[in-house]
C-alpha cells in the first residue's frame, strides 16, 4: 500500500513524493528514451554546364566536361577555349597560325573596322575582324610598326625609326621618307639584285629623271635642324623627283640608308649638297659622281647622318 506525503506551505499544499508503506523509499526515476539521430542525405551534385567564371578565368562545360581547343559563340561573343579548357583572355593568342585578340572577359575583340585597341595596357593594331595588321602602317596621321602578334612597337627603334611610349613614330616625316625610299627601290631596281646594284640603279635613275628647280632650298631655320633631309627627300619621292641638289642628296641618302649603308648629307657654303658614304662621294655635279674617291675641294657647312 502506498502513502502520499503532503507538504503544506501556507494555504496550499504540494505533493513531494510517493512513499511506500514499508519504509518510505522513493520509486526510481524513469529516463525517457531519446530518438536515434538520423543522417541527412547528401544532395546530388548538379553537373556543370555552359560558361562559368572560376576565379579569374572562364571555362565552358558540357555535362561537367570542359570544352577544349574550340571556338564557342555565346550571346553573340566569340570565345576560344585552350587545351587546358581556360578561355584565352587579356591579350593576343595564336590559333591555327593566326593571332587573335581577347579582352579581360575572354571575348574576342572584333572592332568592325581597322583600329588601335588597348588591352591590359598594351596597344594593338588590328583589322575589322581583330587580326593584326602587321608591318608599317600610317593611321590617323601617325606611323605605327606592328609586330606579328599585333602589338605596336613601343619604346624601341625599328629600321632606324624611333617609336615612343605611345606606340607611334616620334618623327612622322622620317618614317614616311623611309617607306617612300623603300617603294622607290622596289620600282626602280631588280628584286634579285645585290644592294650595291640596287643603289647604283636608283642613283642613276634619280640623276636622269630629276626635274631640277633652283628655288627648293631649305630655309635658314630648317638648316638649324637635322630633319630637313627627310622633308626634302620625301618631296622628291612624292613629286616626281622635283627638287634641287638638296633634294637629290637627301633622296640618294634615303635610298642608301634603306639598303643598309650609313650615308651622310654634306652641305657646303656654295649652296650645294652631296652624299658621303665610307669616304666616297655621291654627287649630281661633275658629271655625276658615284662612289668617287675624290671631288673638288670644299668646306663643310653641315654634315648630317641620315
Give the positions of each predicted feature.
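Loop/turn elements at helix/coil->beta-strand transitions in domains of secreted/extracellular proteins
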Residues: 195-200, 257-262, 280
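Secondary-structure boundary elements
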Residues: 176-237
